[in-house]
Amino acid sequence: MDPRSEVMLRQAELFQGPLLIAGAPADGLLGQLPKAHGWTWHAGDQALLESRFGNRCHHGVGVPEVAFDAAILFLPKSRELAAYLLNALAARLAGRELYLVGEKRGGIEGAAKQLQAFGKPRKLDSARHCQLWQVTVDHAPEAKPLESLAERFELPLEDGPLQVVSLPGVFSHGRLDKGTALLLEHLDGLPSGHVLDFGCGAGVLGATIKRRYPQSQVTLLDVDAFAVAASRLTLAANGLEGQVISGDGIDAAPGELDLILSNPPFHTGVHTDYQASENLLKKSGEHLRKGGEIRLVANSFLRYQPLIEGALGNCEIRAEAQGFRIYRATRG
């Protein structure tokens, strides 16, 4: 069980009523709290929770429309996302209890200070390298629309500026990361047809391809509901159309693709997690047409070339700069 869940269950008597667990981990916590509902923005966690707890699990970027008398937030990695979520929960909890649980290395002590906007927070427990905090919401805020927290910026590209809309919690929020910037410089000679932007984040790659090759069918895929929402906003800001889907890894992608583009993720929260990236590399051939291509950027220290060669039988390094490499391979 997640150590944060274990700390929460040390105070189980506090959580026996109607409760919303925001950022619910994919463990057995809901089974211990029969009146609780879970809310997650991670597609993989949602699938696991739904298989065990059915309609007590909710997925998306907004607070679920269910009744609850208290809520607890499992602290996310992003401080901006935590602020949005705490505000959204506190807006529904005037005079009631809001809890926050997180790992010490995830910044729980600093994040707990955000509770001061709603009342007088107090630490209830500290164990398993985690802390549990509580505040009675004496000052309920107005809920802020998610779009009001969007960061909008312009990318100067060869074919004109691209408008990018990023949301709290999305990778490289409010700026272009170095890896994607390098990949944008090496999008020459791409095959046309059905293109997948895997781990799309704010949708920079997918939007760039759709504008540059308007006849292409572009699908954008991310495990995170906030990234899915940001990608849709980025497409709309540029007058572009594309299919944006929420799913856990390459298994959620369509087949018969002509091109997979990616700056694949290797973090889950504060933890390093290479599973999604390694599955992408190992299974890319199952989703590509014959002659289809995968082109991606990754940190130079990651040993991705052997995985790509093992899956597709070939792999070339197209470029290397600033600690990143561009890999290209085709399905024979």
Swiss-Prot record:
Q: Which residues form a coiled coil?
A: none
- Outline what the protein does: Specifically methylates the guanine in position 1207 of 16S rRNA in the 30S particle.
Species annotation: Pseudomonas entomophila (strain L48)
Asked if the keyword Transferase belongs to this entry, the reply reads yes
Which SUPFAM superfamilies does this UniProt record tie to the protein? S-adenosyl-L-methionine-dependent methyltransferases
Name it.
Ribosomal RNA small subunit methyltransferase C
Q: Which gene encodes it?
A: rsmC
Arranged from A to Z, the UniProt key words for this protein are: Cytoplasm, Methyltransferase, rRNA processing, S-adenosyl-L-methionine, Transferase
This enzyme catalyses:
guanosine(1207) in 16S rRNA + S-adenosyl-L-methionine = N(2)-methylguanosine(1207) in 16S rRNA + S-adenosyl-L-homocysteine + H(+)
Q: Which InterPro entries match?
A: DNA_methylase_N6_adenine_CS (IPR002052), Mtase_sm_N (IPR013675), rRNA_ssu_MeTfrase_C (IPR023543), RsmC/RlmG (IPR046977), SAM-dependent_MTases_sf (IPR029063), Small_mtfrase_dom (IPR007848)
Q: Which HAMAP family match?
A: 16SrRNA_methyltr_C (MF_01862)
Gene Ontology cellular component list:
cytoplasm
Q: Which GO terms describe its molecular function?
A: 16S rRNA (guanine(1207)-N(2))-methyltransferase activity; nucleic acid binding
Subunit info?
Monomer.
Question: Which Pfam families does the record match to this protein?
Answer: MTS (PF05175), MTS_N (PF08468)
Q: Does the keyword Manganese apply?
A: no
The family note in this entry says: Belongs to the methyltransferase superfamily. RsmC family.
- Locations listed in the record: Cytoplasm
What is the top EC class of this enzyme, as a single word?
Answer: transferase
Protein EC: 2.1.1.172
